[in-house]
Amino acid sequence: MNSAKLIDHTLLKPESTRTQIDQIIDEAKAYHFKSVCVNPTHVKYAAERLADSEVLVCTVIGFPLGASTTATKAFETEDAIQNGADEIDMVINIGALKDGRFDDVQQDIEAVVKAAKGHTVKVIIETVLLDHDEIVKASELTKAAGADFVKTSTGFAGGGATAEDVKLMKDTVGADIEVKASGGVRNLEDFNKMVEAGATRIGASAGVQIMQGLEADSDY
């Protein structure tokens, strides 16, 4: 397993500067991470800087609340793809899920999948705000909507991924789609727990620390 290829090297802070974006791009190229995940305003720049690299550009849609209208999310997705995004991480309509308006949740995801035109779509369900049954339902809706991944967290809601939630999500979706763990994955121990639970992608701002931990691990 090439652990670096599981990592979306992430910088989504609102105060992110061009200098900081340059840093994560350089790190992603050096460590051969799967992608850099940046806010939409940085997509075009990141795509230009990574044009000669295997590192993909990932961005976020309806982020971090998921409370944008479906039309807005679809437009944001089209704009991001036009600017060079390879992968889309969207946030579901969490309130609609809690209301039991499952058709609305699924249609919201489907609109982004359609707008992404074949590009990878990961669906953030914000597990810290959901109970067991809601996590199961959100995962089922993500699968039914044709997305590629179900993802735990934005990292902006006061909690992140847990191995228990990742396992529940993976058990729910099976082999049909993948699971991304994000939020609070800060070191090699966290990384290993998420992978063992079934995650095949890790979103982390600590990608370098994780890789340094792997290099220091005598079993690696």
Curated annotation (Swiss-Prot):
What is its subcellular localisation?
A: Cytoplasm
InterPro entries in the record, alphabetically? Answer: Aldolase_TIM (IPR013785), DeoC (IPR011343), DeoC/FbaB/LacD_aldolase (IPR002915), DeoC_typeI (IPR028581)
Keyword Magnesium carried by entry: no
Which EC class does it fall in? lyase
The protein's UniProt keywords, in alphabetical order, are:
Cytoplasm, Lyase, Schiff base
According to its UniProt record, the EC number is 4.1.2.4
Q: Name one GO molecular function term.
A: deoxyribose-phosphate aldolase activity
Q: Which Pfam families match?
A: DeoC
Pathway(s) it belongs to: Carbohydrate degradation; 2-deoxy-D-ribose 1-phosphate degradation; D-glyceraldehyde 3-phosphate and acetaldehyde from 2-deoxy-alpha-D-ribose 1-phosphate: step 2/2
- Which reaction equation describes what this protein catalyses? 2-deoxy-D-ribose 5-phosphate = D-glyceraldehyde 3-phosphate + acetaldehyde
- What's one GO BP annotation on this UniProt entry? deoxyribonucleotide catabolic process
This entry carries the following GO cellular component terms, namely: cytoplasm
The yes or no answer to whether the keyword Cell division is present is no
Source organism, top-level taxon: Bacteria
Q: Where is the signal peptide?
A: none
Catalytic residues (UniProt): 89 (proton donor/acceptor), 151 (schiff-base intermediate with acetaldehyde), 180 (proton donor/acceptor)
> What's the family?
Belongs to the DeoC/FbaB aldolase family. DeoC type 1 subfamily.
Task: Name the job this protein performs.
Answer: Catalyzes a reversible aldol reaction between acetaldehyde and D-glyceraldehyde 3-phosphate to generate 2-deoxy-D-ribose 5-phosphate.
What's the protein called, per UniProt?
A: Deoxyribose-phosphate aldolase 2
Q: Which organism is it from?
A: Staphylococcus aureus (strain COL)
Q: What is the lineage of its organism?
A: Bacteria, Bacillati, Bacillota, Bacilli, Bacillales
